[in-house]
Amino acid sequence: MLRSSITQSRQLLLSPARSRTASQWLPRAGASNRISGQRFFADVKPPVVPGAPTPASPSSDTPIPPETVPKSTLADEATLPPPPPPPPAPVRKTGRFRRFLIYLILTSGFAYGGGIFLAMKSDNFHDFFTEYVPYGEDCVLYFEERDFYRRFPNTLRNANRAPKDEGNKVTIPSKSGLSWKVAEEESGADLSAKGPHMSAVEQKGDEAQIKPGTAKPEEKVAAVEKAKSDKPVKEEAPKDTTKVQEEPRKPAVPAVTPIEFATVNEGDEAVVQELVKTFNDIITVIGADESAHKFSGTIIKAKDELQKIGEKIIAIRDEARNAAQEEIKEAHATFDESARELIRRFEEARASDAAQYREEFELEREKLAHAYQEKIRTELLRAQEVAEQRLQNELVEQAIELNRKYLHEVKDLVEREREGRLSKLNELTTNVTELEKLTTDWKEVIDTNLKTQQLQVAVDAVRSVLERSTVPRPFVRELVAVKELAAEDPVVEAAIASINPTAYQRGIPSTAQIIERFRRVADEVRKASLLPEDAGIASHAASLVLSKVMFKKDAVAGSDDVESILIRTESLLEEGNIDAAAREMNTLKGWAKILSKDWLGDVRRVLEVKQALEVIETEARLQCLRVE
């Protein structure tokens, strides 16, 4: 309300000035526009007429040359009619829908961008974003592909490469190559002897390979179809022992005797085992080749050398172990001799130290005995002196006591003589003293009552400022007066310290303002009451629309929904129970509690101020009761 009134007053004050300024500057603006529309050239010299005035020199006071001043324009200005008034300004469109659409697009873009960035950094958020956000999975997949292509730029280059030209296809007949049956090796077969396996000449026949250069396309197709139609021969289990087994087919290439792996009997060393493993890997590679028989002699020699190397390593290890055992024995003997020598030296040092300590102990004992004797002698002398001094003091005290008794007796005699005349004077002095004491006590009572009344008046002033103000007003001066009047009261100081500085510096709202603001907050809370905790933009829009058509219901005592809490709070505010209303609003949860947080802060400051004033008034009454 205050802001709207200030804005209206500013508009009213500024509108006449603006109209006057616009009307004054319109003709001048038209003239300047006309002048600015013309072109002038400073480098063109006007014709010099005889008798014309000479131009001003640089030393004269004229800052602008007269040649550059357009005379005809000023003459025409008086003859021109006044410009028409400007047309009224068109009504400016608010463009709320356009702004809403732009904000929605920007917000969605920022939200999707941040979501995609977090999804690429966190696996948990990646699952949530791709599962619950529309088009989230496509966006994340697109950026992941871009990141992959950025890291591996050669991927697309290899994928787009043209396939290689393999030339003519090579077809392998169906029955060429090795067979699944193992060929029976004849006794006494020698791989080094000449035979069909040693010949490099190709056999002629139907099973020979078709050369890729001479084969026709029809033959290639027929060979491929034939290879596909052939199936592996399945071995049938013999049902009857009397049937003759099928004779196995001989393989095209004879079987090669595998080379045995190298083994070292005493190869428990890691180096030997690693060497044997490497050698066996070499044997495996050679055995997989068809020309393994060529390296059989070399492999056998290498195995013998490997066996010798293993034996040498074992021998070297045994020699090193024996040498180490001898060195260990010698070291043990040396250590034993050193230990015995060390023990002997230790015993000698301990004996010498014991003798030295014994001598030092005797010297110290004699010193201590002498010191104690001197101390006892000194204590005896001091005790004797103290006893003599105590005796002298007792004698002096007795003399003083005798003098005191003598003076008391003399005083008693004098008092008896003055009893008759001074008795009434003593009574009068006593009465005057009691009267002075009573006057002092009553003065303190009056001062206390006056201070209590002033404190009550200051508290009433603070309360009147809070109750009569229609807008929040600061009450710093009134609160300072209360603090000065109760400077030595810890209760009042604690109550003032409990008030938030913002409350007395800016003021607190009245009850009517609290109720009015509650109604505005209640509308916003009703709009957000249908929102879940993880609501999106669509949920906000749906909640805003549904809040317009919601019906208000009656408050239920045990209900904890938002509408019931708002109705109970409103009824409590109308009854004047602000504390209970704040407690009701504090039970809200989620968006409703976030929206009502500022209202609860204002109510809390109001309650703090009221509670502090009640405490100060109670303390003032308690002081009055204490005085009575």
Swiss-Prot record:
Q: Which GO terms describe its biological process?
A: cristae formation
Q: Which residues cross the membrane?
A: 100-120
Q: Which domain of life is it from?
A: Eukaryota
Membrane topology note: Single-pass membrane protein
Give GO cellular component annotations, separated by semicolons. Answer: MICOS complex
Q: Which residues form a coiled coil?
A: 301-444
Q: Where is the transit peptide?
A: 1-41
Q: Where is the composition biased (Polar residues)?
A: 1-24
Instruction: List the keywords (alphabetical).
Output: Coiled coil, Membrane, Mitochondrion, Mitochondrion inner membrane, Transit peptide, Transmembrane, Transmembrane helix
Renumbered to this chain, the Basic and acidic residues biased-composition regions fall at: 216-250
Biased composition, class Pro residues, residue ranges:
47-56, 80-90
The residues on the Mitochondrial intermembrane side of the membrane are: 121-628
Where located?
Answer: Mitochondrion inner membrane
Which residue ranges does the record annotate as region Disordered?
Answer: 1-30, 44-92, 183-252
Whether Cell wall biogenesis/degradation counts among this entry's keywords is: no
Q: What Pfam families is this protein classified in?
A: Mitofilin
Please give the subunit comment from the record. Component of the mitochondrial contact site and cristae organizing system (MICOS) complex.
**What's the protein called, per UniProt?**
MICOS complex subunit mic60
> Organism, per UniProt?
Aspergillus clavatus (strain ATCC 1007 / CBS 513.65 / DSM 816 / NCTC 3887 / NRRL 1 / QM 1276 / 107)
Its organism's taxonomic lineage begins at:
Eukaryota, Fungi, Dikarya, Ascomycota, Pezizomycotina
